[in-house]
Amino acid sequence: AASLKGAVHSLRSAAHNLRHDPQGVLASAVAALKFKGSGRTDLPKGLYEGRGKNHGSAAARAYEEQITGYPVEYSIYVEGDLAKVEFDGFRDGVLLDAKGPRTYVIISHDWGTKALEKMQTQMDRQVDALARGGLDIPIHWHFAEKGAMEIAAKLNVPPAITLFYTSPK
């Protein structure tokens, strides 16, 4: 019964996404089918490229690609990290995380408390994954909205993470 409920929830979620962002759903499906890796060779020992999990709205995908310089179907992971902590990209010796448009809307309201808690947890998990992997690599979080970055700066941001406002192109 639980698996049936999960399947129904997944179908409802997919139908909702298809109604509200059909291009995003199609892009995610195509990316999942095509994934073969980018063939990049710039990753330091201890990091690897894997299938990306974050395929939000078209604007969020475009912002992630702007920040990372790679298609959203690619993400970066720490070798040996069973928790599979994801980073959106790696460039110039820095791990990257992109917080796209509409993040401010989500985290600026009273009901955004859970989203802020998830953001704090994500920061902590990223830093912990690097520590477990014995890696000393800086992490840069880029925000498409200055207000979202300012709210995130009030969290307990670990020293390994630096926040930036980078406007979408």
Give names to the regions the model predicted.
Residues 1-7:
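Membrane-active amphipathic alpha-helices enriched in small hydrophobic residues
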Residues 9-20, 26-169:
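Catalytic toxin/effector domains delivered as secreted proteins or via bacterial secretion systems
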